[in-house]
Amino acid sequence: VYKRQSLSALLAAPGGGLWDIGAGSGAIGLEWLRARPEGQVFAIEPHGERRGFMDKNARRFGLGHDERDRFTVSGAHAPDAFDAAAFSPDAVFVGGGLSREGLLEGAWQALNSGGVLVANAVTLEGQAVLSTWRERVHGDFTTLSVSRGEAVGRFTGVRPLIPVLQWVGRKP
């Protein structure tokens, strides 16, 4: 739902290398490749079912087998997966796993100078991690909120989705 806002912030980064942590369906990484044809993505997703969605979405996005080397996937947990990356990132997206020990620190250390890190949190625990992180490296917070129309009897009501706290930081 908040893919556009996240991609907009990520695409402000120079270069073409993205780490997508907690990649889920792979949408952020695949859209990154669409916007950066020379780019590459290292997607980290420990849940097998979600990695299956990623493969289906890669085909749907038209990412052929000859291009799959630009979209590599690790089934390990972050930050343990970081050592398997073939490149240092110009941009990092954290869509899940914020409360894992060392995740933000490791991603920030790996991030190239001038690079952008975007982290989205929907839980209070994730938001607490981002609040503490912001005290260390600054950056900007945005709360993203969307409501959708749905039937309420014969009328239409508006139901809010879970809001997302987004933190964006650029590494000096």
Label each PLM-derived region with a short phrase:
Residues 1-2:
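Short, small-residue-biased leader/transition segments that mark boundaries at the very start
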Residues 8-14, 34, 109:
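Glycine-rich helix-loop-beta junction characteristic of Rossmann-like nucleotide cofactor-binding loops
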Residues 15-24:
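Conserved class I S-adenosyl-L-methionine
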Residues 25-37:
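Conserved SAM-binding loop of SAM-dependent methyltransferases across substrates and taxa
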Residues 38-42:
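Short beta-strand element of Class I
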Residues 44-87:
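S-adenosyl-L-methionine
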Residues 72-118:
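Active-site segment flanking the S-adenosylmethionine/decSAM binding pocket
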Residues 106-165:
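C-terminal substrate-binding/active-site "lid" region of AdoMet-derived donor-dependent transferases
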